[in-house]
Amino acid sequence: MLLSSKNDPKLYDNFEEIGLKSAIKNNDVLIKINLGAYQKNHPRTDMTLLKKVVAYIYNHGGKCAITEGCSGFLTENLITFGFEDILKQYNIKVIDVDLEECDEVISYGEYHYIPKCFQEYPVRIAIPATSKSNDMLYSNNIKLFFGAVPRKMYQLDDSDIPIGVPRPKLHQNLHLSVANLFLAIKSYSEFQYYINGGLAYNENIGEFILSDTFVGNNALELDLYMFHNFFSNCEFPNYLDILKTRTETVLAVDRSVP
């Protein structure tokens, strides 16, 4: 399911239609965002949208934590981008995945390390920064999870990967690792809700604001929609083709089972 809205009342109607409203009542909610330290032309989750989602959760009987991998600086980064009042108002838990213990999950032969705390939250929401920056892959819901695993588990002793890449092991076979990591998290602690809106970045036009907010339950469907509607002048990422093929294979197998 993929729904869009141009205003808050319709957005909240869409939350209800995808099942978010009923899911959050009396539940703990985990929100995965994209928020590194400030860099020019560096994508980040739209803070206005994030504030709306947090307020919606608490107004409907839930409570939440926010997570991202920031080498211990997630709270500081949130404050830098104007989120301090919300953190205090709701006493939100901040989880920097780089400091968390993890479980090993094998996905298509690749070893991945998923934070154990993810399973403590029955409801999981992804709010990425929709972007395609120079010399980087198109990034939205699926690639968001590159920042959902501890950096210490993805280092290499000797690497040709450029200095500054936080998880070099993931870059040895980049597109395959994007797909495998997404499926590892899906099997261990699936994120059921995806919200795309607000600030976005396209290498050909720079920063822009999405006129609609898009919500859904299927990360691949939403990634494909956002790419074809807002990034068709950019390079299409192979990891989406990998996931499309795997999804089609699973569906074909399911249909063949009596």
PLM features: residue spans?
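Extended, low-polarity segments enriched in aliphatic/aromatic residues
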Residues: 1-30, 36-258
